[in-house]
């Protein structure tokens, strides 16, 4: 899918989310390396649409995009060393779901995407195709974002 069509779909289905106070707050939190939670969520939505296009089955693109944008809607800096976020990987999906339900009307698919995107770290598997797609898109984006940081650090170390 070409970049313009992906961007159009993200804004078609998620403009209210992107403009929300919570998503604006996500711009202040780092997710992986120098990537903000906001940018990570956008990347996951983009990657989800790319993966969905490869599926021969019907995909609810609206739920896919909205769930992807909100999958990390936990709204805190998990890098803070206060001890309160030590098990972030295990618990942030429920926090994200709580915040998303407070701020938006979510359908079953969107709720499942947010709650289960950390599978298999969280042991209950996704129920819907859309949830599986966002789960994989999140893993792919996180790996890319994290390895970019490691690659840069390794390059700087190697150069002395």
Can you say where each PLM-predicted feature lies in the sequence?
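Metal-dependent phosphohydrolase cores
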Residues: 1-160
């Amino acid at each position: 899918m070409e970049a313009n069509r992906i961007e159009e779909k993200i804004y078609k289905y998620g403009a209210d989310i992107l403009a929300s106070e919570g998503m604006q707050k996500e711009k202040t939190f780092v997710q992986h390396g120098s990537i903000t939670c906001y940018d990570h969520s956008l990347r996951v939505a983009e990657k989800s649409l790319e993966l969905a296009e490869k599926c021969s089955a019907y995909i609810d693109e609206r739920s896919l995009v909205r769930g992807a944008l909100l999958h990390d809607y936990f709204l805190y800096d998990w890098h803070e060393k206060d001890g309160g976020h030590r098990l972030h990987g295990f618990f942030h999906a429920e926090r994200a779901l709580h915040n998303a339900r407070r701020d938006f009307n979510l359908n079953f698919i969107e709720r499942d995407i947010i709650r289960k995107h950390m599978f298999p770290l969280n042991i209950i598997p996704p129920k819907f195709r859309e949830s599986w797609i966002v789960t994989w898109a999140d893993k792919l984006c996180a790996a890319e974002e994290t390895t970019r940081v490691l690659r840069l650090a390794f390059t700087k170390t190697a150069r002395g």
